[in-house]
Amino acid sequence: VYTLPFFPGEKRLGKLRRRAEHFPLAVASAERLREIPADAFWALTAPLNIGPAPIVGDAVLPEPMLDTFFKGRQHAMPVMIGSNSDEASVMAVFGVDIAGQIQKLRRERRFGLGLIKLLYPGVKGDEALGREVCRDMAFTTLGYVVMQAQQRLGQPCWRYWFDYVAEAEHETYLHGAWHGNEVVYVFDNLTRAEPVCQYASKADPAFAAQVADYWANFARQAGTQCSELTGPVPWPACQPGRARLLPRVL
């Protein structure tokens, strides 16, 4: 997931020992850890957690996902992939200081930072620029990389950019749609999901229905003989040399 480094399997033993000391366990083993309820793990923070990327190098995940795509060993199948406009909302959970990343570039790669700024005209301040750069490096870039990988296998790819914010949440989500905000729209369950069901306007479920239809049409129509998904706005698949994108911008 993302373009963040995966967690090397050889480091997991150190994590296991630290977790055993944290709970505490008399014997530091995977078997003893599995006996602990799952709810005890989700709230763990560094250095006890392994997020946001998974462990790699074992039977479950032998190599990093991106390596598989670069080597062309992924399944040959249509893909839908995209990102949200404020994916940087989750960077603090990842342990990333978005303003600090820009400050580091200024110290170590001043010329490179100058080039990066050309890609974001009008964006002022380290935090604002860091939000844009970290979002694109960790999330937006991944969609482009996967698109190219599937095209090399002769498979179509549909990319999206999700920027819809519920009408009652504009003051909360000042920079756009947060990481994961698209899920309730994809599954069209705004009227059932908390807390959005408490304040969803008439326009919000209407938009969610359109989003869900695109996803359903992808499941029904996507294939090597399909170049466009039907919907309120026809959604063409990306073509070699043409990186098409379905936007939703408020």
Positions of the model-derived regions?
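Stable alpha-helical elements in mature extracytoplasmic
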Residues: 12, 16-19, 29, 142, ...
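Non-catalytic, well-ordered alpha-helical segments in soluble enzyme domains
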Residues: 204-226
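Mature extracytoplasmic/periplasmic domains
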Residues: 221, 225-250
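A generic structural signal for well-ordered alpha-helical segments enriched in polar/charged residues
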Residues: 22-23, 148, 152, 213, ...
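Substrate-gating cap/lid region and adjacent catalytic-acid/histidine neighborhood
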Residues: 3, 26-202
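Fold-level recognition of mixed alpha/beta catalytic cores in primary-metabolism enzymes, strongest
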Residues: 1-21
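Solvent-exposed, acidic/flexible segments
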Residues: 13, 139, 204-208
